[in-house]
Amino acid sequence: MKTANRLGFERFVVVQPSAYGRDNSCLVDAMKELGVSKCRAIVDVDDDVSDTELEKLNALGARGVRINVSPIHPYEDGLADRLLKRIGRMEARCAEIGWQLDFLLPGWLTEHLLQRMSKLKVNFTLAHMGMLLAKDGPNQPGLNRLIDLLVNGNGHCWIKLTAVYRMSKVPGYTDAEPIVHRLMDAALNRLIWGSDDPHASFADQVGSVELFNLLGEWAPDEASRKAILLDNPVKLYGF
């Protein structure tokens, strides 16, 4: 919270970490401590979670379900098809309660699932810019397809400018900037920034202040930063 206060943040979106699986206890504690006026959350739940449990989480500030596959998961034939059942079930549950889906996926899996995502009837976010690797450049096929979805889709797709250190290994993450600019040009009104604090296994390599300052380089104009940091998350998470 010291870093958040230093940066001037007053509202928060907390996301269930992969390390905790579907045990949302710590996340629930955070929601209770912060309060629903200041906090929203993305939880990870079983497909057969009860309506009562979802309603309890909703009252605390939960607004979505995470679809979680390790962002470094290597290509696995058939994995995309196996995920379709969970995506369909969670889409239906989210639609009932007014929630969204939050995807954490490796880039190859993001690309494989874009067609299914284009048909979703609820809002959804792609963490870490879909994990489309910066080394593959701003004209890579997956990014082109994502841009097409942002421009020509139904408006449900939102992009998280998070954890650039996962998709770029270049000092200063300079190779990610052209990708960010393409996303900004395509759909500035559906981009949100997140610190991804506490950065898990990258904590000794990167800090939230550094990442916040990087956003200032990507979006030097105040209007763009206001959209990404304030207007868009208020709309998406219902503050």
How would you label these PLM feature ranges?
Residues M1-S18, R22, N58:
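An N-terminally biased module of ancient metal coordination in phosphate/nucleic-acid-related enzymes
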Residues S25-I42, M117, K121-L126, A176-A187, ...:
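Short, electropositive alpha-helical surface patch
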Residues A80-W193:
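Catalytic pocket-lining loop regions of alpha/beta-barrel enzymes
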Residues M1-R11, L188-R190, A203-F239:
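Mid-to-C-terminal alpha-helical segments outside catalytic/metal-binding sites
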Residues A19-W108, K160-M167:
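Active-site gating/metal-coordination segments in enzymes
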Residues D47, M131, H199:
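Short, glycine/acidic-enriched loop or turn micro-motifs at the edges of active sites
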Residues A4, L27, L57, C94, ...:
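Conserved, mostly hydrophobic/aromatic
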